[in-house]
Amino acid sequence: MAPSSPSPAAPTRVSGRKRAAKAEEIHQNKEEEEEVAAASSAKRSRKAASSGKKPKSPPKQAKPGRKKKGDAEMKEPVEDDVCAEEPDEEELAMGEEEAEEQAMQEEVVAVAAGSPGKKRVGRRNAAAAAGDHEPEFIGSPVAADEARSNWPKRYGRSTAAKKPDEEEELKARCHYRSAKVDNVVYCLGDDVYVKAGENEADYIGRITEFFEGTDQCHYFTCRWFFRAEDTVINSLVSISVDGHKHDPRRVFLSEEKNDNVLDCIISKVKIVHVDPNMDPKAKAQLIESCDLYYDMSYSVAYSTFANISSENGQSGSDTASGISSDDVDLETSSSMPTRTATLLDLYSGCGGMSTGLCLGAALSGLKLETRWAVDFNSFACQSLKYNHPQTEVRNEKADEFLALLKEWAVLCKKYVQDVDSNLASSEDQADEDSPLDKDEFVVEKLVGICYGGSDRENGIYFKVQWEGYGPEEDTWEPIDNLSDCPQKIREFVQEGHKRKILPLPGDVDVICGGPPCQGISGFNRYRNRDEPLKDEKNKQMVTFMDIVAYLKPKYVLMENVVDILKFADGYLGKYALSCLVAMKYQARLGMMVAGCYGLPQFRMRVFLWGALSSMVLPKYPLPTYDVVVRGGAPNAFSQCMVAYDETQKPSLKKALLLGDAISDLPKVQNHQPNDVMEYGGSPKTEFQRYIRLSRKDMLDWSFGEGAGPDEGKLLDHQPLRLNNDDYERVQQIPVKKGANFRDLKGVRVGANNIVEWDPEIERVKLSSGKPLVPDYAMSFIKGKSLKPFGRLWWDETVPTVVTRAEPHNQVIIHPTQARVLTIRENARLQGFPDYYRLFGPIKEKYIQVGNAVAVPVARALGYCLGQAYLGESEGSDPLYQLPPSFTSVGGRTAGQARASPVGTPAGEVVEQ
C-alpha cells in the first residue's frame, strides 16, 4: 500500500510569517497575555452595541386609525461619564476569562502542532483480491518519452528538500492508460469509489495515473472529490437549522491526490460537472442523469469553496507569489468612480467596516455606497448617520429588520407592482375625506416604518405625522389602526420603493457585518458547547445568514472574533461557512491581523467571504507592514492565516508603534468637556498625515464632491474622566516604560512574579482615606498581572483596542499624561479618519470605537472586493499583493494633510 499525501486537515504550508520579535520594540514579557485578555474584552464589549434589550417605552393604548396617541419614541438612559471607583463584576470577570482563554490557546497550539492529519489511504478491496483475476494493467505501457514528459517527478531524481509533512514521491518503472480490477476495465479520467477504512464512507476520486512502481507494485493515483462532510464543514452538514441543507449528491473537486495500490478500487461512479450558472431546468435534468455532481472545488487553504475554471477542473496554484499588483496605478482613482454597487451593513456599529470597505473599493475603481445600515445601539446609529448622511440607518434588532423586509416586499407587491391596486385610489381618497369625529386627528403623512420593537407586539408599524402638530408629536401606529388611510399607506410605500428606503431581494450587491456571538464568551458560565446555536446569545449568526438567504446579495463579508473557530470545535465558524456553501455561494475564510495593515494594534479577527457563482470570489490582501503573527488556530483552520510564508521575503513597511499614531495630538486634562478643538500643530509621521486627510482626499464620497462638516478640526479628543481616587493613583504612576501599580509605594514583587505587600511599609492612603493600591489590583490574575494602572509607551503596540477605558485591569494610561487614552487616540488605533465624528456619552463613544472593525483592514478588503466585482481579480490564488502605493494613498494627495495652523494653542476649544 502506498504512502499517502497530506490530507486536507493537515497543515502543508506555513500559515504565517513567524520570527522572533525584538525586545526593544515590544515588551514581550506581557504582550501575549495582554492580547488574549484584550481580545476577550473585545468579544464581551460587542454586547453593548449589537444586542440586548432597550428600556421599554411607557405602555400605550391602541386607538382607531386617525386618532392621535401619546409619543412612543424609544429613549436610552445616558450613563455618567466618570470612571467607577472600583471594577464592576464584568471587569473582575476578565481575569477568569483571560485564564480560560490562555488555556484554550495552549490547547489549540498543541493540537495544531501535534495532531496528525487524516490521510486518504485506500484499503485493499477484499472482493478484488479474492477474485479469479488479480488486478492488472492492460494494454501496452505509455511510451517512455511521453511518460517522462507527463509525469517527470516519477522518473527524475528528487533534488528539492522534502518538507516534514510532505509525502515522498513514488518512483515509476512505466505508466499505463488502463487497468482491470475485478473484471472491470478502468481508464484514465474515470471516477471511482475507493475503499476507505473501517466504518468510513468510501472515498471518491478521479483516476489521473496508472503506474508500476520501482518496487514492482501496481499503483493508481486519484484526485479526490470531497463530500460536504469530508470538508472543514464536516459535522455541521446535518444540523437542524431552517434553510440549512446540503444536497447529499453534491461533491467538491480538490487538488488533493494520493497514490494507492490498484486493488483499492471498488467500482465506477458517474459524476458530472454542473455549471452553477446554467439554466435551472437543464441543471436539474443533468443532475438527475448521474450518481453525483460537482459545481465547485474545495481547497484546505483558506477553507475555499470556489467555481471551477473549466469542465476538467484545471485550476491554478494556491500560492501568493503569482498574484501581484505592482503595475496598478492608483493615481487614476482620485476622482469619483463611475461604476457603483450597493452595501448593507448589518450590526454596523458606528460604521468602521462599511467605511473601510467603501474607501478601499474606491481605490479599485468601484463606488461602493452604504445604502442601508442596521444596529441596535442608537448612539452608534447616530454616529453612522452623521458621517454617512445618504445612508438609511435603522436602529433596530436584526431579526426585526428581516421581518420588516419580508413585510415590505408584500406592501410593494400590493401598492407598486400590482397595477390593479391603483384602481381603488379614488375610493380610498373619498373614504379618507369623510367627516371627522371631534376626538379624531388627521394623518398628514407617514414618515417611517418598522416591525415591532420596544414594547410593541410584532407587526408593521408606521410613524405618523399628524396634521397641525410638530415632529415631536409623531407616533408609531400599527397598520391595523390605519385601515381608514389606505391612500396614505400607498403614497408612503410608492415613495419608499422609489427611494429604496428598504432593500428588496436583488437590490443589495454586498452585505457586510459582524453578528455578535456572546454565547461563546467566558463571561457566559453556562455556555452550550454541544449545540451553541440553541443559545439565544448566538442566534444572531443564524439571523445574519437568514438575511443573506433572503436578499441574495452578490457578495457577503462576515467578521467575527477568532473564538468562533475555537469554541466547541469551531462550531460557529463552520456553521457560517456551511450556510454559504449550502446556499451555493463560493466561500473562503481567513484570519487577519490589524497591525499588518498599518496600525499599532495586533487585533486578530476572522473574515469570511461569500460570492455568488456568477461573480469572482474575492481574495485576501497580503500584509503591507512587518508584524509578527502570533497565536495558533485549530487544526481544521491551520491554513487560514493571511500572511506570507516564512520562506518568502516581501518588502514590507516597518511595523507602526503608538507614537507613530498619536504623538501629534495636543495635551488634554483628565476632564476635557469639549469635543471639538484645534490640532495645535502639524502631523509628525506619515500615518498622522494620512489620518488627517479630508474626506475628498481619502476618497470618501459620503458628502458627494463637497467637504463634510468639521473638516480640519480635532474631534472627540476626550478621555474618560477618572474619579478622584483613580486620578490620584494615575498621577503617582511613574512616567516611564512599563510602569504600573507595582511601582506604587507599599508593593513589592515576590516569588513567581506575584505581587505582595511590603511588610516594612505602612499601607499608603489617598486623600479620601482609601488605599493607594486597591485590593483588586493585587489579586488580579492571582497577583501576576502587570495590567492594573499600566502606562503605555511610545515604542509599543496595543494588543487590542477594547470598549472600556477604565485603568483598573488594562494598560491604557497615556505615556506622559495623567489620564487614559482619549476617544480620538483609540479611534486612531482603529484607523478611523480624524474627520469621523462620534456621538453619545463618552463611555458610549469608547464602545463604538472598540466594537468597530479596524478601518485599514476593511479598506484592504474593500480593494480586493472592488477588484473582484469589476472582474479584475483573476486566478484561483486566495491571496493578493496590494499595490506599493496602497499604504500611502489617497493617490496623488497622499502627503497632503489639512492640519490646523501651527500657531493655534494646543487644546483650544472651537465653539460651534
Swiss-Prot record:
The keyword Metal-binding does not apply. Residues 1-104, 148-169, 312-334, 890-912 are annotated as: Disordered. It catalyses: a 2'-deoxycytidine in DNA + S-adenosyl-L-methionine = a 5-methyl-2'-deoxycytidine in DNA + S-adenosyl-L-homocysteine + H(+). One of its GO terms (molecular function) is chromatin binding. InterPro entries: BAH_dom, BAH_sf, C5-Methyltransferase, C5_DNA_meth_AS, C5_MeTfrase, Chromo-like_dom_sf, Chromo/chromo_shadow_dom, Chromo_domain. GO terms for cellular component: nucleus. It is an enzyme of class 2 (transferase). It holds the Pfam family Chromo. Its EC number is 2.1.1.37. Residues 312-324 have a biased composition (Polar residues). The keyword DNA-binding applies. Keywords: Chromatin regulator, DNA-binding, Methyltransferase, Nucleus, S-adenosyl-L-methionine, Transcription, Transcription regulation, Transferase. Residues 341-872 form the SAM-dependent MTase C5-type domain. Residues 43-69 have a biased composition (Basic residues). It is found in: Nucleus. Residues 184-309 form the BAH domain. It comes from the Eukaryota. Involved in the CpXpG methylation and in gene silencing. Belongs to the class I-like SAM-binding methyltransferase superfamily. C5-methyltransferase family. This is DNA (cytosine-5)-methyltransferase 1. The gene is MET2A.
